[in-house]
Amino acid sequence: MIYPENILLLAPLSGFTDLPYREAAYRGGCRYAFTEMVDAASLAYASGGGEKLLMRSDFERENFIATQLVGSDVELIKRACDKLNEYDFDLLDFNLGCPVPKVVKKGAGAALGRNIEHALRCFETMTKYCRFTPTAKLRILHYEDPAPTLELCRGLVELGAQALTVHGRTMEHFYTGTVNFAIIREIRETFPEIPVIANGGVYSVEDCQTMRRETGCSRVMLAQGAMGHPWLFREIEGGMPPTLEEWRDMVSTHISGMVKLYGEESAMRRARKIVHDYLRGRGFPSALRNRASVLCRETELAELLKDAVPAAEVTTRKIIISESGSASSLP
């Protein structure tokens, strides 16, 4: 099997899982990662900066790295595969699950999954023209009835899919709502000959434990839960959360990598949402998030990180100082 048991994977996230993002995930304990989702039309027409999307690190050359193709035009998928064949990846995944409107309105991603016949035609084209191990990622097609999703999965497996990643929400649910564990479990039990990776709603160690228990899948893909929290991989495997200094170093190193890749102006625009994710849920004052929204220079990030002290810690310090009788020294 292409995936061993009991592994965690980083999902292909458009606009996020570039090389610096993946390197942050590796430092956080990830071992199986995908590049950003790659649009077939952009590759076919040589537009959209495909080279940077498909860059590999030295670690990835020696270990595992995969990419994912999205599209609904058979001819463009064929041409995109010709371009992808110039690169080295461990596998090529086909996207049948992206619910983002700009993808869905083109009949691709989760919308393509609804058109099973054409979805299978597109996947067959990819398997025919790419030189990589083919896999697919999809969303469940109906929340109560597993039959349509099983039909799609059966067709993909018959065409040679070596693994399936299943997001347990429908296209309409987007990234909210309850994950349907039962349908993921039924897919895993129906196709025991291939790895089935469970996906959707994993934001914590407890979420991952629930996903594994309820679906029977030992392989789990992390997506939004890993945004700003690359340590989630090691925490799920029993490791400790980051210290404040480790957190600061991770953010600084991540954004520094982006500056090297894109140049400071472009990198800092991209970095705003990344830094927001790193700040989320850690008790930092809202003023830091406001500053993250307007970052333009790496030096501004350095100042923000220097000022990043969780509100609870600030409150504790104030109480201690007040009791010592030197409250007047506080700003």
Q: What kind of feature is each model-predicted range?
A:
Residues M1-L9, S14, L19-P20, R121, ...:
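Alpha/beta catalytic cores of nucleotide-metabolism and tRNA/nucleoside-modifying enzymes
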Residues I2-P4, L13-K83:
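Glycine-rich, positively charged N-terminal anion/phosphate-binding segment
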Residues L8-A11, A33-T35, I65-L69, L92, ...:
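Hydrophobic faces of well-ordered beta-strands that scaffold small-molecule active sites
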Residues A24, K78-L92, L96-A108, E117-I194:
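Alpha/beta enzyme core
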Residues E36, R114-N115:
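Short beta->alpha connector loops at strand-helix junctions that form conserved
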Residues E36-A40, N95-K102, G168-E172, G201, ...:
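Glycine-rich phosphate-binding active-site loops on the catalytic face of alpha/beta enzymes
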Residues A44-G49, V104-G107, A147-P148, T176-T178, ...:
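Short secondary-structure transition/capping segments
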Residues G107-G113, E237-M240:
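Short glycine-enriched, charge-decorated loop/helix-capping segments at active-site entrances
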